[in-house]
């Protein structure tokens, strides 16, 4: 195939992110300067985000048999880039007093972002695997970045070993699927599934192994055991990246796969397996979060439940399913960045461990009322309370479930949401209690004048605005025609 200017434009976000990575690497090799490195990263990610505007003018376009850039890919590229941008902004103040080399964190984050961009535009199992590894491998280093802290090192080792096992399952599953189908392209697999050619035991084992690999990356039950430990041990900005960009990219490619091969969900075994995983993730995630006194662990278990809610829309996979997932992921990214942003500010500058214990937030309202308001809005949004962005996402998922008559899943979703309400309210109540005598962590006095603080206030206002008036988000989803090309 001939490479035209349209192909070049379609790859702009990925090319700009990769170029930023190289420039940052050369800048670090020339002279270490933390602020300069962070600024370069922010400029590069902003340019990559702006480059999506010309990309929309040439979509849908198949750049290679491996990569398809359409409106669907553009929407999720934007979510990945916004998540990365927020994490870089939060990391700058957080890393100011870090005793080791600070600049490499930005290199790893940019590399993982490039992997996320490849993943959301994948239309072939080979590009799915390449994107997934390009996303996962830098995260190993990011999780263990604060290696002076034993928990961070332990989290890094745990995530590396289990992630490698998940990738091995995924790769072996792909090999079995290829042996039976003779194709690795999503469209080719979709055609084979529609013709009912893929029905042997090898296919069942292959799909099962792929489900294990992707289930690990999405921290779905029963592949979730790493999640709370890794969220707790990783530096706060890295936990934010794991909860947002990493999950968005993997779920986007999984949804694309099922949208191109919708007949796969007609397979009773696969449908039942996904339904059981969804119910288990919703109930276990919420029930295990009830007992947590560590906010990062609580948000880790909460993310398991949220991915369970998203599986409901994936299983429905018709009507508004793609739009529902888009709305839910956009609102989930917004609120997760806000919640982890507050934890990051409370832990800034780095002092050996993060402010993740619930008692450290006791009476925060009396010291930092605006920061408390931000955290309150985030908790309400994660709980799916009306007038917050989270409610719109949950409403869409329930609507899709009702449309597809998935009554058991809707029941689990409602029950899970009711349980979730308790532990989100517990965090909120703690913020307004009487201050304790001993205080270990607190946000910097001038937190509201820093880039991270300004961003957090903007996120809280946006979460409230979208809850009251969600039309702009819905119009973006409809105008971008959040439908899959091909």
UniProtKB/Swiss-Prot annotation:
GO molecular-function terms, A-Z: NADH dehydrogenase (ubiquinone) activity; NADH:ubiquinone reductase (non-electrogenic) activity; quinone binding
Top-level taxon of the source organism: Bacteria
Keywords associated with the record: Cell inner membrane, Cell membrane, Membrane, NAD, Quinone, Translocase, Transmembrane, Transmembrane helix, Transport, Ubiquinone
EC number(s) from the headed UniProt entry: 7.1.1.-
Keyword DNA damage attributed: no
Principal location: membrane
Family: Belongs to the complex I subunit 2 family.
Reactions catalysed: a quinone + NADH + 5 H(+)(in) = a quinol + NAD(+) + 4 H(+)(out)
Transmembrane segments: 8-28, 38-58, 73-93, 105-125, 128-148, 169-189, 196-216, 235-255, 269-289, 304-324, 325-345, 373-393, 405-427, 454-474
Quaternary structure (record): NDH-1 is composed of 13 different subunits. Subunits NuoA, H, J, K, L, M, N constitute the membrane sector of the complex.
Topology in the lipid bilayer: Multi-pass membrane protein
Gene designation: nuoN
Example of a GO cellular component annotation carried by this entry: plasma membrane
Coiled coil stretches, renumbered: none
Stated role: NDH-1 shuttles electrons from NADH, via FMN and iron-sulfur (Fe-S) centers, to quinones in the respiratory chain. The immediate electron acceptor for the enzyme in this species is believed to be ubiquinone. Couples the redox reaction to proton translocation (for every two electrons transferred, four hydrogen ions are translocated across the cytoplasmic membrane), and thus conserves the redox energy in a proton gradient.
Compartmental location: Cell inner membrane
Record-given protein name: NADH-quinone oxidoreductase subunit N
UniProt-listed GO biological process terms: ATP synthesis coupled electron transport; cellular response to antibiotic
Organism (species): Pseudomonas aeruginosa (strain ATCC 15692 / DSM 22644 / CIP 104116 / JCM 14847 / LMG 12228 / 1C / PRS 101 / PAO1)
């Amino acid at each position: 195939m001939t490479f035209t200017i349209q192909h070049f434009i379609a790859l702009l976000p990925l090319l700009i992110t990769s170029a930023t990575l190289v420039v940052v690497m050369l800048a670090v090799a020339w002279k270490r300067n933390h602020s300069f490195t962070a600024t370069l990263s922010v400029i590069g990610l902003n340019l990559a985000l702006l480059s999506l505007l010309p990309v929309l003018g040439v979509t849908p376009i198949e750049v290679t048999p491996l990569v398809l850039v359409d409106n669907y890919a553009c929407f999720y590229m934007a979510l990945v880039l916004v998540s990365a941008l927020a994490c870089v902004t939060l990391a700058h103040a957080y890393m100011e007093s870090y005793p080791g080399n600070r600049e490499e964190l930005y290199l790893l984050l940019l590399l993982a972002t490039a992997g996320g961009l490849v993943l959301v535009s994948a239309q072939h199992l080979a590009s799915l695997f390449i994107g997934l590894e390009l996303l996962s491998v830098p995260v190993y280093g990011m999780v263990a970045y604060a290696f002076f802290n034993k928990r961070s090192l332990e989290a890094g080792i745990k995530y590396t070993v289990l992630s490698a096992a998940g990738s091995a399952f995924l790769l072996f599953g792909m090999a079995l699927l290829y042996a039976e189908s003779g194709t690795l392209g999503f469209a080719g697999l979709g055609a084979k599934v529609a013709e009912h050619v893929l029905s042997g035991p090898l296919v069942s084992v292959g799909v099962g192994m792929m489900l294990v690999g992707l289930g690990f990356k999405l921290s779905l039950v029963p592949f979730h055991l790493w999640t709370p430990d890794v969220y707790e041990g990783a530096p706060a900005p890295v936990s934010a990246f794991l909860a947002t960009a990493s999950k968005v990219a993997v779920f986007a490619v999984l949804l694309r796969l099922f949208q191109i091969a919708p007949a796969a969900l007609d397979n009773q075994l696969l449908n039942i397996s996904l339904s059981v995983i969804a119910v288990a993730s919703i109930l276990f995630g919420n029930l295990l979060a009830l007992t947590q006194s560590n906010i990062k662990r609580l948000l880790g278990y909460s993310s398991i439940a949220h991915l369970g809610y998203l599986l409901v829309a994936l299983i429905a996979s018709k009507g508004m399913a793609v739009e529902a997932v888009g709305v839910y992921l956009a609102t989930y990214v917004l609120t997760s960045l806000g919640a982890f942003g507050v934890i990051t500010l409370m832990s800034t500058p780095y002092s050996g461990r993060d402010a993740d214990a619930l008692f450290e937030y006791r009476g925060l309202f009396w010291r930092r009322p605006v920061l408390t308001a931000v955290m309150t809005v985030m908790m309400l949004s994660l709980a799916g309370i009306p007038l917050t962005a989270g409610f719109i996402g949950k409403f869409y998922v329930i609507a899709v479930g009702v449309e597809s008559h998935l009554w058991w899943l809707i029941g689990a979703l409602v029950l899970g949401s009711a349980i979730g309400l308790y532990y989100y309210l517990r965090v909120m109540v703690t913020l307004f209690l009487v201050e304790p005598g001993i205080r270990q962590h607190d946000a910097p006095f001038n937190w509201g004048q820093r880039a991270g603080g300004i961003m957090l206030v903007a996120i809280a206002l946006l979460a409230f605005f979208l809850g009251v008036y969600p039309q702009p988000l819905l119009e973006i989803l409809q105008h971008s025609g959040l439908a899959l090309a091909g």
